[in-house]
Structures are given as C-alpha cells and as structure tokens.
Amino acid sequence: MLDKLAFLQEKYEDLGEKISDPEIINDQVQWQKLIKEHSEIEPIVMKYREYKTTQQALGETKEIMHDKATDAELKEMAKMEVEELEESIVEMEEQLKVMLLPTDPNDDKNVIVEIRGGAGGDEAGLFAAVLFRMYTRYAERSGWKVEMMSLNESGVGGYKEVIFMIKGKGAYSQLKYESGAHRVQRIPTTESGGRIHTSTATVVIMPEAEDVGEVNIDTNELRIDVFRSSGNGGQSVNTTDSAVRITHLPTGLVVSCQDGKSQLKNKEKAMKVLKSRLLDQMIQEQDAEISQDRRSKVGTGDRSERIRTYNFPQGRVTDHRINVTVYKLDAFLDGEINEMIDSLITSAQAEKMQEVQ
C-alpha cells in the first residue's frame, strides 16, 4: 500500500508541474484531462501526507517518552499522546485502503431512474408513486435537480411506470445500489377487513450515458414511431403526434416518451433513456462475467432480486442484502435515506477490500 501511495504522490507532483506548463495550457483538451486526473488523486495524496506527518510525530513523541532525561510528568503526557497518534494512524490506514479501492468510472454521473409497479395491482402502482416521491425528496435534500422523462399513470393516483433523471455530481455513486425489487406491506385504504397486502415495485438505476463516444448508436438500427399522447396534458397534447417510440432493432429495447408537448424534446429524452439502457446493459454484461464466488452481494443490481421491504404496520424498512433495519419509515419515505445508503456503500467497500487482500 505504501509503495502505491508514494507512486501517487510522485504522479500528483508531476501533474502539478504539467498543468502549469504554458504549452499544455494552450491545449485545452489535454489540460482539462490532466486537471481532472490531478483533482481525482488529490484527496488520496493529502490523506497520505497527513499520515506521514502523523507517523513522524509518533516517532518524535516516542523518543521523548523513552528519553531518560525526560521528567515523569512529561513522559506521562508523551505516553497519552503516543496512544492517540497510534489510534489516528490505524484510522488513517483504513481510510487510505478505502481510497485506494478501484473506483467505478460512472460514479460521478447523473442517473436515470425507472420505477414500475409490479405484483399487486393498483397497490403496486401507488407504491411506485411513493418510491418516486422518496427519490425526488432525496434528490432535493442533496441539492440535485430532477427532470421528468416519461410518466404512465395507473388511474388511481399511482404509476404504471415513471422515468426521470436526477442531475448531480455523484448521484450514481449514491443511488446505484437501489436497483431491484422493493416490497411493501400495508393495509390498503380500500381494505375493510384490515388485512395486510403485499405488493412490489421494481427500480432500475442507470448512469446517464455521455453524449460523446460512450455509447454509439447507428441511426439505421433505430425504428422511430410517432403517435398521439394519451397523457393528462390537456387537449393540446392529444391533437398532435408529439409522443415518440424508439426501437433499437439489434437489442429489441423499446423506449417511449410522451411527457412533453414537443415531439423533438420527447425524441431527445427517449434517446437519452435508450443510450443509458444500452450502457446499463453493458455494465450488467461485465458484472455477469465476474465469477459467482466473487460477485458482490450488494452490487449485483439483479433486477428481480428482492432487496428491501417497507413494512407500514411496524414502521420499519429492512434491506435484505445487508440485514439492516431502520424504524423511521415516514422519514425514510420523505427522502431521509442516507443512513441506508451509507450502510450499503460501506458493505460494498468491505467486500471489495476482501477481494484485493
């Protein structure tokens, strides 16, 4: 680990010199690339420098503690300081191990979220709407923007399907473990006998595909159909062919968008979703190549995997992958999901650390 940290510090200093070079500054593409690389390794280098400074302080304090000329009171103070410094060093070593873990290249990206009502009829659609509100409230609390892509309502205040984008640095790193089947247990308002019903909704989290180079789509492989929107956007929505359906012929992926009144905007949104689905498909294929014994319990992103249960009578939320339960259901559904997300990230990091050891 120390060799790798020393190498990164040397690289950081070398990059610092390069980004100050007038010739490189004139090449904005190269300069931006170096700036990005420099900023990515800066936190690790700063932590490594702090670690080395603490190591040096520990050595000096130990010398004072073992010096025969040091009086008893000062030795006692030095002993206490040694204990504190040793604790700090152990903590920093763990932090550095985590910082050196391989990073997901998609972590900083915006995300496209797809939520669909599953088993349970109208209740499933209502639960899909609850999850939509939960994620949009979480986005607001994080200072991120939400952009609606497509909405298909169920007619009872629920959603058959809702697709939206969350724009914010690091959105994918925080939300990528939300993909899977979410289960709800509650008493429907229409249930006179007070029986608890179980229904599900599926969530898919995809990183937004970059416009340049990341996902190449041949326009000859697309079939684009336009049709009249069936949404609740007023009469003007239904009098023009503003809705768009794009079919990617090689994969059979189909994306529809009818949320806006502009056919052009609907087409742009549908293309964004299609690109992100294709990128997500590539990620899923890469994950499938990982041998079963090394596959992360948290990060499989299996779309059919039941990952979480929301139990209304007991006021609890349980994540089945990490066996964590929180008893703050109302707050959780209002977007206060950081505690669960942090636990999932910590668990995923622990699994990665076991793999690299």
Curated annotation (Swiss-Prot):
It comes from Alkaliphilus metalliredigens (strain QYMF). The modification N5-methylglutamine is found at residue 235. It is found in: Cytoplasm. Peptide chain release factor 1 directs the termination of translation in response to the peptide chain termination codons UAG and UAA. GO terms for molecular function: translation release factor activity, codon specific. Methylated by PrmC. Methylation increases the termination efficiency of RF1. Belongs to the prokaryotic/mitochondrial release factor family. NCBIfam families: prfA, PRK00591.1. Pfam families: PCRF, RF-1. The lineage of its organism: Bacteria, Bacillati, Bacillota, Clostridia, Peptostreptococcales. SMART domains: PCRF. PROSITE patterns: RF_PROK_I. One of its GO terms (cellular component) is cytoplasm. This is Peptide chain release factor 1. HAMAP family: Rel_fac_1 (MF_00093). Keywords: Cytoplasm, Methylation, Protein biosynthesis.
